[in-house]
């Protein structure tokens, strides 16, 4: 399958145009792809009809590649409205800049329909390079969105270099000319005289062709009639087809009939004037490229507001090399360069003193400190390695201290994965632009987490910002549970890729060692990992790299036309030195490791390759091999029909059902009608007419109001007295589960059975107290399905949110964005924020427990006899916090607003393997974390 898919992406051998209609249909199918399938590929051993891939020019000198091509819709939204109305733009993204290449393809399709037929013929003859958009078809050449503002005249200098001239060409002139040995179509059809240099006639460069310099114009020719072609101009393209002296005759011979043809010329004098400018342009390139892509039109405002916030990252040395005092000699790197960060930079001596003094006094390394700057509290995290110190400072109101400690560990892990060590990253001057780019994205994620979420839904942005406090630094990847048959299909596709025993990847194909060994791969869809064949350590490091470079939120929306990343990496799992204690343990080969990431639409496929060992040894700085890129891209093309089934799993996740916190805040009886007809309940309950009837309405929780109670950590709730006009059948949700069960079972309703079936489809319960009324009427099978969906104990569902971390496999599961968006509600959104911040603090206790357990294990190994050391506190394995909340906008001053209580509980499991569970549920029931964890973790495998 992979071989067939790959064959479609290769260039076709030249053939004479047959049925043009069939060819046009065939080409239109290829052009309808998202931009990635239309790109050709090539290899050194392939035929000369293959075309260079578009990303080849973006490979850096050190072999790295970061190429991003947006989808057509996103390309249009990237430029101002005045330009997007008439242009379709292609974006070429490298490590240092984003370049928009404008193209008048829309107008050309309308005004020049004959050109399409001409283009199809050229494609069928493999004369049309797939990168023909590189030359701008408008008067504006390539424009960098990083170097110009939208209000500036971005094409002033480029207009002097390129110009488009439309001329009329009639191939029928050839029939009027007597047959001669050599007919120069450039002179006969266009009227341009080009004299080939004698040194080119028998030169090896003749195969690549010579630049078509205009040496003269034929009187009466099309070029002279246009009045725009001058002697000295260079013809670079015909209808966006790159031409040289080698292929100009073949390109002109493909013109089917009389038509208008666009000629692109380059002014030779402008080329000479701009030869000295490339180095200056590189120096002016910005490091905010991905931020502009992610934030869109708000990029400038976001970046300006970010720079006004005091934040900094510094890499300092503790040992000065010379006695002579030199200003800032201890600073090896710092970012950003702004007025707000300058104040933090000026007090770096305090950080150095604390790091040195506390370690000498206490014997432990300093991890964090706090200071006040202009009335704002700033947290600073420390990470010391040998005689170097990494510092990251962020405002306390934006980033809590436990999160900052996790963030600096995550940054250090990612930089070591990219460069091998912190010294290699910060002490090499050529890495400075890449580090600026890295920390630019890092601070944007830290200070504006909601801005980088590409969904237009405000609830999704709020959830992304609230959950980033905890989820972004968990030692795991967000996992999406899939059905077994779908999981097998994904596993098969990745296994076929990793086998690498077909076509060019086979050693028998060239009778030589393959270049790389594929160690494994991981597949992401919309930021969720759906399949992985990599060890836990590799998965965590690769996911951290993608997260730090904002690739996961980028793939969450269909913005990727094609993404190709190639770089050498240093995975800790493979490069750690072997232990001397076990000589029979597996020894990793001495090789080099490379990461290949290919993105297409919502997919992101990460492949880890090894050079050395079974494969050939890598020398120098190898760039990406086109064959491997094609095979990975072909694997993604095989999954084109799978994305719809994954979308179904996102919409109806098989995870446990959730309840909305707003449902538990009772409204007055006179407001019950408005609550039961709210968009949230109507969307989840469906078009049930009985939901608004009086007999059914009394079963809604909104008809029952709480009896106001003082804040208390007690989990024993009291009943309430029925208010005037209400039936005494109403229950307080703080009543015991037995009382709820007895009274609910006495109120049966056939309508609730249909509601339960609807809830199974939507994976969220419309109202937690709307389902228990008819449990005795459900069949045994329906009860079993209901119990599987409901994680909490008791007759009703009281689960609000959860996070389950499986540290052995490096994954965690949590409700999807779609599930949280369905619940909505102002109280529930605040609950989500409180949940993640509280879990962050609870996990800090668990991390301390794990450190103590490791120390205990080491001490037990060194001392066979039990030690008499007594710890002041027992290891924390379960921790809970009780919250109470009331409606924000409570207008009835005569009545006390209702109060809802909920618990946030975290549980650490050390045996049989480390696991962490965090749940949020209503105070009306008592939950056992072990039972909930068993339901969540049972059968959870990669």
Swiss-Prot record:
Keywords: Cell projection, Cilium biogenesis/degradation, Cytoplasm, Cytoskeleton, Developmental protein, Phosphoprotein. The modification Phosphoserine is found at residues 674, 678. It comes from the Eukaryota. Residues 185-267 form the PDZ domain. Coiled coil: none annotated. One of its GO terms (molecular function) is phosphatidylinositol binding. Residues 137-156 have a biased composition (Polar residues). Widely expressed in E8.5 and E9.5 wild type embryos. Present in various adult organs (at protein level). It is found in: Cytoplasm; Cell surface; Cytoplasm, Cytoskeleton, Cilium basal body; Cytoplasm, Cytoskeleton, Microtubule organizing center, Centrosome, Centriole. The keyword Cytoplasm applies. Residues 33-48 have a biased composition (Low complexity). Residues 1-56, 128-156, 707-751 are annotated as: Disordered. Disruption phenotype: Embryos die at midgestation. Embryos exhibit multiple defects including neural tube closure defects, abnormal dorsal/ventral patterning of the central nervous system and abnormal anterior-posterior patterning of the limbs resulting in severe polydactyly. Fewer and shorter cilia are present in mutant embryos. In mice lacking both Intu and Fuz, the lack of convergent extension and more severe patterning defects in Intu and Fuz mutants does not result from a functional redundancy between these proteins. Plays a key role in ciliogenesis and embryonic development. Regulator of cilia formation by controlling the organization of the apical actin cytoskeleton and the positioning of the basal bodies at the apical cell surface, which in turn is essential for the normal orientation of elongating ciliary microtubules. Plays a key role in definition of cell polarity via its role in ciliogenesis but not via conversion extension. Has an indirect effect on hedgehog signaling. Component of the CPLANE (ciliogenesis and planar polarity effectors) complex, composed of INTU, FUZ and WDPCP. Interacts with CPLANE1. Interacts with NPHP4 and DAAM1; INTU is mediating the interaction between NPHP4 and DAAM1. Belongs to the inturned family. This is Protein inturned. It comes from Mus musculus (Mouse). The gene is Intu.
């Amino acid at each position: 399958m992979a071989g067939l898919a790959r064959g479609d992406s290769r260039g076709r051998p030249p053939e004479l145009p047959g049925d043009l209609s069939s060819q046009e249909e065939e080409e239109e199918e290829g052009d309808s792809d998202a931009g990635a399938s239309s790109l050709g590929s090539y290899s050194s051993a392939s035929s000369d009809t293959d075309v260079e891939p578009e990303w080849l020019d973006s490979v850096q000198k050190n072999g790295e590649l970061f190429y991003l091509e947006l989808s057509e819709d996103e390309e249009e939204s990237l430029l101002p409205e005045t330009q997007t109305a008439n242009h379709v733009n292609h974006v070429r993204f490298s490590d240092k800049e984003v370049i928009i290449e404008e193209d008048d393809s829309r107008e050309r399709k309308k005004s020049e329909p004959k050109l399409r037929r001409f283009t199809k013929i050229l494609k069928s003859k493999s004369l049309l390079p797939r990168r023909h958009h590189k030359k701008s078809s408008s008067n504006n050449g390539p424009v960098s969105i990083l170097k110009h503002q939208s209000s500036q005249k971005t094409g002033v200098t480029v207009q002097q270099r390129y110009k488009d001239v439309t001329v009329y060409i009639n191939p029928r002139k050839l029939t009027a000319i007597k047959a001669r040995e050599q007919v120069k179509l450039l002179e006969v059809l266009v009227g341009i005289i080009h004299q080939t240099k004698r040194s080119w006639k028998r030169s090896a460069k003749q195969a690549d062709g010579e630049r078509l310099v205009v040496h003269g114009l034929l009187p009466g020719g099309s070029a002279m009639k246009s009045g725009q072609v001058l002697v000295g101009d260079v013809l670079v393209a015909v209808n966006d087809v790159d031409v040289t002296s080698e292929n100009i005759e073949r390109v002109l011979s493909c013109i089917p009939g009389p038509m208008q043809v666009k000629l692109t010329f380059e002014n030779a004098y402008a080329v000479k004037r701009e030869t000295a400018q490339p180095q200056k342009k590189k120096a002016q390139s910005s490091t905010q490229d991905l931020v502009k892509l992610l934030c869109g039109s708000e990029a400038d405002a976001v970046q300006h507001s970010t720079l006004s916030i005091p934040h900094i990252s510094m890499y300092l040395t503790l040992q000065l090399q010379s006695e002579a005092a030199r200003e800032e000699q201890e600073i090896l790197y710092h970012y950003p360069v702004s007025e707000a960060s300058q104040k933090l930079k000026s007090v770096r001596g305090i950080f150095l003193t604390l790091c040195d003094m506390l370690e000498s006094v206490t014997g432990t390394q300093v991890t964090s400190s706090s200071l006040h700057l202009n009335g704002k509290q700033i947290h600073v995290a420390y990470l010391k390695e040998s005689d170097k110190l990494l510092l990251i400072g962020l405002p306390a109101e934006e980033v809590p201290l436990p999160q900052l400690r996790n963030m600096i560990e995550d940054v250090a892990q990612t930089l070591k994965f990219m460069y091998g060590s912190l010294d290699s990253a910060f002490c090499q001057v050529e890495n400075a632009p890449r580090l600026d780019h890295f920390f630019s994205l890092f601070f944007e994620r830290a200070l504006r987490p909601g801005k980088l979420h590409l969904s237009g839904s405000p609830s999704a942005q709020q959830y992304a910002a609230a959950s980033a406090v905890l989820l972004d630094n968990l030692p795991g990847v967000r996992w999406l549970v899939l059905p077994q048959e779908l999981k097998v299909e994904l596993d098969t596709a990745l296994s076929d890729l990793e086998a690498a025993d077909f076509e060019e990847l086979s050693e028998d194909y060239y009778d030589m060692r393959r270049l790389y060994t594929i160690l494994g791969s991981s597949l992401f869809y919309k930021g969720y990992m759906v399949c992985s064949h990599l060890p836990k350590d590799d998965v965590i490091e690769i996911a951290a790299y993608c997260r730090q470079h904002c690739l996961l939120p980028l793939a969450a929306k269909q913005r990727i036309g094609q993404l190709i990343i190639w770089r050498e990496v240093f995975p800790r799992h493979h490069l750690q030195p072997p232990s001397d204690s076990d000589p029979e343990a597996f020894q990793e080969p001495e090789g080099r490791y490379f990461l290949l990431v290919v993105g297409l639409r919502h997919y992101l496929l990460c492949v880890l390759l090894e050079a050395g060992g079974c494969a050939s040894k890598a020398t120098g700085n190898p760039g990406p091999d086109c064959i491997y890129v094609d095979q990975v891209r072909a694997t993604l093309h095989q999954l084109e029909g799978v994305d719809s089934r994954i979308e179904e799993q996102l919409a109806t996740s098989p995870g446990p059902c959730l309840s909305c916190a707003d449902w538990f805040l009772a409204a007055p009886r006179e407001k019950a009608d408005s609550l039961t007809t709210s968009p949230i309940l109507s969307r989840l309950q469906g078009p049930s007419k009985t939901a608004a009837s009086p007999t059914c309405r009394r079963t809604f929780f909104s008809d029952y109001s709480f009896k106001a109670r003082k804040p208390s950590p007690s989990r024993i709730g009291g009943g309430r007295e029925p208010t005037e006009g209400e039936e005494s059948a109403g229950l307080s949700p703080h009543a015991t589960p037995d009382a709820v069960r007895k009274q609910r079972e006495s109120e049966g309703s056939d309508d609730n059975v249909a509601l339960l079936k609807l809830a199974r489809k939507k994976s969220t319960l419309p109202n937690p107290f709307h389902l228990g009324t008819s449990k005795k009427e459900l069949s045994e099978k329906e009860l079993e399905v209901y119990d599987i969906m409901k994680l909490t104990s008791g007759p009703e569902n009281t689960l609000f949110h959860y996070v389950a971390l499986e540290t052995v496999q490096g994954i965690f599961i949590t409700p999807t964005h779609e599930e949280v968006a369905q619940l909505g509600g102002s109280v529930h959104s605040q609950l989500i924020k409180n949940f993640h911040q509280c879990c962050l603090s609870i996990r800090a206790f668990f991390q301390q427990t794990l450190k103590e357990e490791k120390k205990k294990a080491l001490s037990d190994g060194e001392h066979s006899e039990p030690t008499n050391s007594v710890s002041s506190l027992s290891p924390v394995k379960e921790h809970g916090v009780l919250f109470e909340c009331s409606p924000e906008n409570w207008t009835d001053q005569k009545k006390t607003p209702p109060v809802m209580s909920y618990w946030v509980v975290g549980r650490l499991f050390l045996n049989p393997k480390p696991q962490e569970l965090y749940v949020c549920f209503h105070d009306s029931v008592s939950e056992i974390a072990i039972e909930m964890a068993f339901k969540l973790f049972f059968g959870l495998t990669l």
